[in-house]
Amino acid sequence: MFRGRKLRLPDGARPTQNRARIALFNMLDGIVGARDTLNVWDAFAGSGEFGIEFLSRRPMANVTFTDNAAASIKTVRTNVAPLDVGARANILMADAMTRIEQIAPNADLIFVDPPYDLSEIGARFVRRVGVAARVGTILVWEQDTDKFMLPDDAQWEILRDKTYGRARFLILQRRA
């Protein structure tokens, strides 16, 4: 729907390789199926590329973007504005860790992609989201292959584990 658009990147952002993003979304299509209506949380939004991809692929998806960097939020707003998605995009300048209890219980799918040098924050976030998320929630955790961590609790089932270059993706599902 939004193909061919170049996304702006905040300074220091690390975009996901196009090949990796396409492969990831093909895997997610197989997991979430034909459901158009999804509540998605792009927790460490950066440029907003993951949430925007969902807005493009799922015309009824609602995406909440959070990031604690003003430059990232400005970039997400710039990238989302020409898409004319209205209320389907909710952009919040906030630390994702402080919004878990408000956002995670309503999310069907959560993207976790903190800066690679902050991998421990990703691990803490995944642990805390596991408490707040509904059973069946899907979580995608992108990590640096050099600093890779598995979830250290039994709240998540690993559905997929794929590596593309430096990026390693875990696709998890909240267990009962």
Give the residues covered by each predicted segment.
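Class I S-adenosyl-L-methionine-dependent methyltransferase catalytic core
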Residues: 1-176
